[in-house]
Design a protein with these regions (language model features):
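C-terminal extensions
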Residues: 306-336, 362-420
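Short, charged beta->alpha transition segments
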Residues: 58-60, 89-100, 207-208
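Canonical Radical SAM [4Fe-4S] cluster-binding loop centered on the CxxxCxxC motif
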Residues: 60-89
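Conserved AdoMet/S-adenosylmethionine-binding subsite of the radical SAM
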Residues: 92, 115-299
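Flexible, acidic/Gly-rich N-terminal and inter-domain linker regions that tether
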Residues: 1-65, 371, 379, 387-411, ...
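Short Fe-S-cluster ligation motifs
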Residues: 96-112, 285
Length: 420
């Protein structure tokens, strides 16, 4: 690798680290014709930076030159940083060479917008086409959609990328206009809708046509920056819920704002800590909506617009709804068992299965992986005491926080947990 390429790589890999939407699950692209890589069988090897962010792929910008001046972005037009740009062939060569050395399993490619949205999207499209068609590369490719690019370019990119994503940037339109007046949620939603509609069309065609081309097989995602503006957690989660339902997104990512701008007084001061604990609570809430059957207004609402940072959102909901407990594990349905703090998806399924063979006892719960010290305040089993003193929510909260104090300290470093 030449010194110039090494310098470009250092600049453009560092500039890409603020984009967290690089999860790679969900693709079933198989190796064909003795090509390179296999997103289906080999999987993606994830690694984490010191602040807990996933950097599993060759994660780079095509260029950090940008015509926009978004206040929260390190690559903004007015920022005095070293600029660089790859050529199409340089990105292709880097990807293939790194893959052959077993450094990576795929490519995450984004870019600043240089000249125009179409010009930038064309260059990125050339990269993925060369990898697929000329290099016969079958590894994982995550391609960022450039906002405002023509529908034809976006549709063609979907034929070669495993996953595509486009960032909402801010949870509220007010926040976006404050820090990025040249952008709008409407434009992002238009591009998300293009891919959604194409996926629906191809799904319908598969009913009558045997061979339909793969199109963004791992779906599309988006990302929001949290903590830059005065948005509430209700703003963030309602926006996420809206996009899950309207655009069939696979994931919504939350990125705690890392202060990098000394010139904008409306942004958090440089040197202040990014809101990692808040970011973690948002991910836990996202998990509840996607896997636990919670509606967004059960987690946050007008009365409770922000998440409790001291306890996870599932426990917070349980403490606010004592009328729902205790749950009789020998009679309750699966969805209600899922709502018990300390019981996850796997444990809930095991409990339902175990009931076919006998009553649920406390010892069995521990064997099934239930966090009993947390769950015990919210359940009844066959061998639970017949008469139990009714405990207040504040008492239960304090007991759980006291029991788990050392655990919560550990969660802050380096990778925050999603565990409930």
């Amino acid at each position: 690798m030449s010194d110039r390429i090494r310098e470009k790589l250092q600049i453009l890999a560092d500039a890409a680290k603020y984009d967290v939407s690089c999860s790679s699950s969900g693709s079933d692209r198989k190796n064909k014709n003795k090509g390179l890589g296999d997103a289906s069988h080999s999987g993606i090897c994830h690694s984490y930076t010191e602040d807990g962010r996933c950097v599993s792929l060759l994660k780079i910008l095509f260029s950090n030159v940008c015509i926009f001046d978004c206040a929260y972005c390190v690559s903004r037009r007015s920022n005095d940083v070293q600029r660089a740009a790859f050529t199409v062939q340089e990105v292709v060569d880097l990807t293939i060479n790194f893959y052959r050395r077993n450094y990576i399993e795929g490519l995450f490619l984004s870019s600043g917008i240089f000249k125009s949205a179409d010009h930038t999207m064309e260059r990125m499209l050339q990269v993925v086409k060369k990898l697929r068609l000329e290099e016969n590369f079958n590894g994982y490719i995550h391609l960022k959609t450039i906002p405002g690019a023509s529908p034809e370019l976006i549709h063609e990119a979907g034929l070669y990328a495993d996953r595509m994503s486009i960032n909402l940037e801010m949870p509220t339109e007010i926040g976006l206009k404050t820090f990025a007046p040249e952008k709008s949620h409407q434009e992002v939603q238009k591009d998300l809708g293009l891919i959604r509609d194409r996926l629906i069309q191809l799904k319908d065609e598969r009913q009558i046509i045997k061979h339909v081309p793969k199109y963004v097989p791992a779906g599309q995602t988006t990302q929001m920056v949290v903590g830059a503006h005065q948005e509430s957690d209700q703003d963030v989660l309602f926006m996420a819920d809206k996009h899950y339902k309207e655009f069939k997104l696979k994931r919504v990512y939350f990125s705690g704002y890392i202060p990098i701008n000394t010139e904008n007084n409306y942004l958090p001061a440089v040197g202040s800590a990014p809101p990692l604990l808040r970011e973690n609570r948002l991910y836990q809430s996202d998990w509840l909506m996607r896997f636990y059957g919670f509606e967004v207004n059960e987690i946050v609402n007008e009365k409770h617009p922000n998440l409790d940072l001291d306890v996870d959102p599932k426990l917070s909901w349980a403490l606010r709804h004592p009328e729902q407990f205790p749950v009789d594990l020998n009679r309750a349905d699966y969805q209600m068992i899922l709502r018990v703090p300390g019981i996850g998806v796997k444990s809930a399924k095991k409990i339902v299965q175990a009931r076919r063979f006998g009553k649920i006892h406390i010892d069995l719960l521990k064997k099934l992986g239930v966090a009993y010290q947390r769950a015990k305040f919210f359940i009844r089993c066959e061998d639970s005491p017949k008469f139990q003193k009714e405990l207040s929510s504040s008492f239960i909260r304090q007991q759980i926080l006291t029991q788990g104090s050392s655990k919560y300290v550990q969660q802050l470093s380096p990778q925050l947990s999603l565990g409930f």
